[in-house]
């Protein structure tokens, strides 16, 4: 009989800050929550910050901690507010295209797949409409 992997379900991750620069929009999450998640799973991402107009067309990333003593981005709209012992993991859609800031709406929830080992954060509730 084969081994079946179980992907955990029922996790909630809430954004706690946002930083923008010329190349991307970075959402922060609570480092304790991120570390408590399993290596792979599905979670509900609650977006609680508005993306500035300048970040609407920029790729989105989520800042995840790389050690136990770091925090993530703050509510400031400047990259200088970031704690630099984090790693920005790009957010992609189901077909591995970068998600842009205008897709991340304050006060909404998004379903996401994450794999901490491979560095994957993929929104599962959006898709690319085929050109017709």
Which residues does each PLM region occupy?
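Short, intrinsically disordered N-terminal pre-domain segments
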Residues: 1-18, 129-132
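Surface-exposed ligand/attachment interfaces on beta-rich extracellular proteins
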Residues: 11-40, 50-56
């Amino acid at each position: 009989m084969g081994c079946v992997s179980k992907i955990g379900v029922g996790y909630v991750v809430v954004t706690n800050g946002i930083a923008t620069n010329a190349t991307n929009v970075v959402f922060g999450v609570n480092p304790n929550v991120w570390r408590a998640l399993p290596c792979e799973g599905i979670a509900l991402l609650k977006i609680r910050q508005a993306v500035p107009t300048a970040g609407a067309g920029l790729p989105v990333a989520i800042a995840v901690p790389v050690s136990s003593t770091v925090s993530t981005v703050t509510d400031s709209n400047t990259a200088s507010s970031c704690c630099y012992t984090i790693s920005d993991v790009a957010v992609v859609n189901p077909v591995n295209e970068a998600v842009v800031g205008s897709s991340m709406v304050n006060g909404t929830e998004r379903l996401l797949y994450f794999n901490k080992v491979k560095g994957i954060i993929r929104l599962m509730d959006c898709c690319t409409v085929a050109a017709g």
